[in-house]
Amino acid sequence: MAQANSRSRNSATISYPEKRRARVNLGKREVEILKTPYLLETQIESYRKFLQKDIAAEKREDNGLHAAFKSVFPITSYSGYAVLEYVGYSLGGESTLFDVEECKLRGLTYAAPLKVNMRLVIYDKEAPAGKKAIKDIKEQEVYMGEIPLMTETGSLVINGTERVVVSQLHRSPGVFFEHDKGKTHSSGKLLYSARVIPYRGSWLDFEFDPKDCLFVRIDRRRKLPATVILRALGYDTEQILDMFYKTNHFHLNQETVTLDLIPQRLRGELAVVEIKDKKGKVIVEANRRISARHIRLIEKAEINKLELPDDYLYGKVIGKTIIDKETGEIIAHANEEITAELLKNLRATKTASLDTLYINEIECGLYVSDTLRLDTTTNQLEALVEIYRIMRPGEPPTKEAAESLFENLFFSPERYSLSAVGRMKFNRRVGRKELTGLDVLSKEDIVDVLRVLVDIRDGKGDVDDIDHLGNRRIRSVGEMAENQFRVGLVRVERAVKDRLSLADVENLMPQDLVNAKPVSAAIKEFFGSSQLSQFMDQNNPLSEITHKRRVSALGPGGLTRERAGFEVRDVHVTHYGRVCPIETPEGPNIGLINSLAVFARANEYGFLETPYRKVVDRVVTDETEYLSAIEEGDYYIAQANTNVDEKGRLVDDLISCRYKGEFTLTTPDKINYMDVSPRQIVSVAAALIPFLEHDDANRALMGSNMQRQAVPTIRPETPLVGTGMERTVAVDSGVTVIAKRSGVIDSVDASRIVVRVDRKETEDDDDIGVDIYNLTKFTRSNQNTCINQHPIVEVGDKVQKGDVLADGPSTDIGELALGQNLLVAFMPWNGYNFEDSILISERLVEEDRFTTIHIQEFTCVARDTKLGPEEITSDIPNVGESALAKLDESGIVHIGAEVNAGDILVGKVTPKGETQLTPEEKLLRAIFGEKASDVKDTSLRVTPGITGTVIGVRIFTREGVKKDERTLEIEKAELSKVEKDLNDELRVREDALFENLEKLLTGRVAAGGPNKLAKGTKITKSYLADLPRQKWFEIRLQDDAATKRLEASHEHFKELRETRDAKLKDSRQKLTQGGDLAPGVIKIVKVYLAVKRRIQPGDKMAGRHGNKGVISTIVPIEDMPYLEDGTPVDIVLNPLGVPSRMNIGQVLETHLGWATKGLGKKIGEMIEKGADAKELRKSLKPIYDLSKTQRFDLEALEDPEIVTLAKNLRKGVPISSPVFDGATEEEIKQLLKMADLPTSGQAALYDGRTGKKFDRSVTVGYMYMLKLNHLVDDKMHARSTGSYSLVTQQPLGGKAQFGGQRFGEMEVWALEAYGAAYTLQEMLTVKSDDVAGRTRMYKNIVDGDHRMDAGMPESFNVLVKEIRSLAIDIGLEND
């Protein structure tokens, strides 16, 4: 499907929906170089790589399931004589028992069984040493649980609900250098640190302390001097110093020392002695600071030796250990400071020279040397023991344990992995050329990290920015599932190792070794309950798409809301074109959950990249290149709206561009790239807001979030003012039906479309070329909204591959349609639009403009209880006849019944324990023998506040339980429907087959056949018409090739019938077999109610610009303000909502909407006057000519198509004003002029109640308004009595618990302030938790006695108990 979508957009032909209603594009840029990519690619592609389902086992790449298996297998026994190897895997083919729809109905997971081919190799124990002889090899397919499959639209069905796994934005593995911003130490000194983050394994941190010593932490444990880890790696003091320092070489004379001079190293030092050239001329006086000029002079004079006094050496550090050559004893250790004493010793032992560390305050500090002095360890073993003590405190260290622990921490592939990404980032950061290498750390890696850290402390190099998108990567579904799978496999590995070491391993098969439970449990847990596996937002097509394109920084291995600071949440320069700066939730998650930008995608390493057009020598080419945030920094990148001449040359002298994350101006010859599109920086939802460029960012954020909450209306209406993204979203979301192949519509009804495919599209002769599309009718979505598809094509219409055949929820002729176009006036109206309230006309209710259908699902479960089974029946104790009127004999409500709150949907009785019966009851039971008293009524009733129509009932019965009448009736109806569908399908396919046969046979010479067909006769149509179609296959032809084709058709005919029978059998089996229900469940009944909700006061509405409000009242049409021609407005908004919010886009949209409506009206008038196609074409041309670029080709349409187009434009000519490239003020004025409307955008309005003209003209026009899924029906709630909390005996809270209203602390103060003592007492006792008092009160009200006497509130008893629990005896004194 993905391919179908992406390809269809590239076709040059005009699509079917566009012919029906084309948008006038007011964008300024030439045709898009890059079409919008398939919007669900991230999810689908990632999961495809994980499964590699249709790729042969040998050809599978090293990722996904394959990689997980390869990383854990082969598993070798402890002895090494048995090995379990992985060969390959296969996923159960298309024969998965239930398809997506059935899984949703039955509450199952849509998955395929995973079968893994494993090989057990057993080696001969008796073989001579050093030679391994294979004794036995067994290969077997092992079942390893089920792997969920992805639906075509990128979601997963888990336990019957559609879920989406959101991609995670996490810190890329690699090495990062940062400082604490001076917050750790009171002096404000910057403390630098480095952190090596692996993909999995222990973290390694290096850090400076305020005294400039280096420390290391492993997994954030207690810190150790950093040189401990270097010693553990096997380096000694001298080697460590050698790695980090250069040395100065001194020769010892009797009284002085001579330095082998490297002039550069003197820079910045004080000259201790005069420095003279060979002629004795003083170059540097004593006690002068040596500057760069002095150094040049010294170099010029070629001075390479310098005699210095002894005290120059004092305090310097020895670089190499000095040994007495005669005795072999150590005189001075490396890293020892030189003192007068030491110099004396050196001279005494006739040491000729020594090396000191070259230290310079500016560029080379003493950090490592100082750290070595702190380090108490002296050799490798001591260092290893020290690390062992930190990692395993309290355990006695042994040499072996310490060595294996350190080895396992960073150098073992099982425990530690940087991954390819981590290695690439690591090598790049420490300045290596090659980007590949081992996944584990090496000695050199650790040394390099320390070296870079020391360099940064010395002022060479910068710290990293962790919010840069080059340091954060995307982890999508496939990768996360793979990690979970690996976790499961590692658990299996331990068990397999133990079993392989058993004595009788020779008699075992791979199946006996591997237990699939841990693997399937890990996968189940991930898809079922991971923080990133979310219940899909299915409000409308946009919310689905956005949910699948979401990127979250939360979740396992990510951030937590509490810890995330401002920096992480902020918009970063690298977000440009990768992550949307606008769309993010308001509230605690702001900035942590983002949306992918329209063109963004993840590269092989998981870094986000965005496309740019290449610019070569000032000329913009059509070549596009994807750049990641890392690569982008080095280039000059121009904006998408930069001025370009016809040949693509950059025109301006100075061009605004981005370079290294800054906006700057530069000359055209420096430009390397240019943006592909102005909407490149925003997400799909933000790209749907016209005039986004005129809105304040905060309101745009609300606008993009609120579009996702729009409820699909009964009759969707596409926006008059759109952005051109509407079609893309409707097609890619998967809610519409898309033609898989081109053809002609053969038949259409409400639930099925049949397309006769063009001959050239059919793959082979066997393919008769019929595509059948079944539509989804009135199904419940995750958000209880209604999913319903209806065809937009008619019989005989030609359709191209990728065209929209049927609209889904919130789509109108293949375009996204979230709301309705309303005539809006910005004016106050009697205070009814105070503070963002909205005033609407009764016309919207009458015309059902915002009526929505919501489908509720009610479930009734009959279980086995200790006292006996629950029963679903219409025989319910103590329930009147009227309450049972809507139930059938089985106790289940009829389809089509109108039900209200409290009505019984499914009658159910539960056995209750035997109770002592009163004599009267005993007598009754003796007479009537009824069991009325030993069961209680636990029927499923309609919850309060819901009224609706029953539209469906599903019954699932446990295997082996007798089915009731209703179940059999439903099964029979379902089966006959399936049978009818299959027969229809067969008929259509057979008709096509015989049509092809007729073409084949007509005019051919026969060699004999039924009805006395003589040899040599030509076959005619009339002969075929008289012959029953079955007998056509008995005709014999003289042409061999034709005979072969006839035989092939006969085979195909038989095949069609067999397929039908097989499908029917399969369906019958699926319908009649008992469901796989949870333990203890006998029967489940699901009842679906359709609730029609009209718009009413209290509902929330919004425009697309963050202009939201609640309906305050609905005014009769005749009272609404009206225009001069008598048109009453639909909705009145408060003008004060615009200036302070700075979302001016809504005003521009209103003006442009009015103009488009006016143009539509003019076209409508022409049609009414009976204009023909020629006249219509003439009047449409100037409108479509407004498009500067991407002009719609009217000439390509035939006359009937022009008429259809014009008819569809009567409601208004839809216009697209792309984001950041939209219509200008001049164009809006021009359009208003064309529509004969005032160019001010304001008109005189008249008061509907008095008929008087308002004092000044008002801004009127058409705005697109949405009804949001915050409906007053779902929020209204009232309670008289209900359930109480167990401990406090106070009423519960919230609508879901049918709770009361909280009377809190402040409300108590209010009553106290008014002195309303009795009211207060009532609130705190009988209306709350005085148990006896409230029962008495209830009785009093029934008796008509309205007195109240308050008793002891239960909360007082709770308080007494609380105090007693503190061992303070407290009790009430009874007087």
Swiss-Prot record:
Keyword Lyase assigned: no
Known catalytic reactions: RNA(n) + a ribonucleoside 5'-triphosphate = RNA(n+1) + diphosphate
GO molecular function terms listed in the Swiss-Prot or TrEMBL record: DNA binding; DNA-directed RNA polymerase activity; ribonucleoside binding
First-tier enzyme category under EC: transferase
Organism encoding this protein: Coxiella burnetii (strain Dugway 5J108-111)
PROSITE patterns reported in the protein's UniProt record: RNA_POL_BETA
InterPro entries in the cross-refs: DNA-dir_RNA_pol_bsu_ext_1_sf, DNA-dir_RNA_pol_bsu_external_1, DNA-dir_RNA_pol_su2, DNA-dir_RNAP_su2_dom, DNA-dir_RNAP_su2_hyb_sf, RNA_pol_bsu_bac, RNA_pol_bsu_CS, RNA_pol_bsu_protrusion
One of the GO biological process terms: DNA-templated transcription
Superkingdom of source: Bacteria
Protein name: DNA-directed RNA polymerase subunit beta
Keywords (A to Z) from UniProt: DNA-directed RNA polymerase, Nucleotidyltransferase, Transcription, Transferase
Role of this protein: DNA-dependent RNA polymerase catalyzes the transcription of DNA into RNA using the four ribonucleoside triphosphates as substrates.
Pfam families for this protein: RNA_pol_Rpb2_1 (PF04563), RNA_pol_Rpb2_2 (PF04561), RNA_pol_Rpb2_3 (PF04565), RNA_pol_Rpb2_45 (PF10385), RNA_pol_Rpb2_6 (PF00562), RNA_pol_Rpb2_7 (PF04560)
Similarity-based family: Belongs to the RNA polymerase beta chain family.
